[in-house]
UniProtKB/Swiss-Prot annotation:
One of its GO terms (cellular component) is cytoplasm. Lacks the C-terminal regulatory region which is replaced by HisZ. This is ATP phosphoribosyltransferase. Keywords: Amino-acid biosynthesis, ATP-binding, Cytoplasm, Glycosyltransferase, Histidine biosynthesis, Nucleotide-binding, Transferase. PANTHER family: ATP PHOSPHORIBOSYLTRANSFERASE, ATP PHOSPHORIBOSYLTRANSFERASE ATP-PRTASE. It comes from Acidovorax ebreus (strain TPSY). Its main location: cytoplasm. The gene is hisG. CDD domains: PBP2_HisGs.
Length: 216
């Protein structure tokens, strides 16, 4: 009996950069998620399907068995905590960084040096809390889910902690990157129970991904 394999992906960059890895495993997604309204997409392998979820929800779907495996950014994995997940591969895709950014006219160094209590807007509260605690900087964290750049511009926050790729969005909103917290890439994550129950098919996919990941 063929075992059903469910892969959780998020739309956008991670989805697009995962396609060559799927191809290496002999799997082709048969519908374009940008054109289809479906949240479950068929593939060229009848036993493999792709479910489309929010990037931050991928670890949760995999942890609780809604998916057998998934591709998630390191940022999402840290915020999730990683419970119940086997993380065999750094796929080295969707690379970016988590950084601190402020208004161009805000003296961040001076505020930190003087021991000011900073208001920081972010959706990455665990990453931000650990980073500022390690520096001995006192912060009030404000949880936001989008349009992070607005927070300093409206006076809601002194700084933001967010993903940065090219930095163009920051520049367009008169913000500057003042500290880099960590580099981010996407990882393959696998449900630990599924790895035991569906070991052979999952191992084939993991091994195919591993062979396709660029070295160095």
């Amino acid at each position: 009996m063929t075992q059903q394999i469910t892969l959780a992906l998020s739309k956008g960059r991670i989805f697009e950069e995962t396609l060559p890895l799927l191809a290496a495993a002999g799997i082709e997604v048969l519908e374009d998620p940008e054109k289809s309204r479906k949240l479950i997409l068929p593939t060229s392998r009848p036993e493999v399907r792709v479910v489309l979820v929010r990037a931050t929800d991928v670890p949760t779907y995999v942890q609780y068995g809604g998916a057998d495996l998934g591709v998630a950014g390191k940022d999402s994995l840290i915020e999730h905590g990683g419970q119940g997940l086997f993380r065999p591969l750094d796929l080295k895709i969707a690379k970016c960084r988590v950084s601190v950014a402020v208004r161009a006219d805000f003296d961040y160094r001076e505020a930190v040096t003087q021991g000011s209590r900073l208001k920081v807007a972010t959706k990455y509260t665990s990453i931000a809390r650990d980073f500022f605690a390690s520096k001995g900087v006192h912060v009030d964290l404000i949880k936001l889910y989008g349009s992070m750049e607005l927070a300093p511009l409206t006076g809601l926050a002194d700084a933001i902690v967010d993903l940065v790729s090219t930095g163009n969005t920051l520049k367009a909103n008169n913000l500057v990157e003042v500290e880099q917290i960590m580099d981010i890439s996407s990882h393959l994550v696998v449900n630990q129970a599924a790895l035991k129950l569906k070991q052979a098919p999952l191992r084939r996919i993991i091994d195919a991904f591993a062979s396709a990941v660029p070295q160095g």
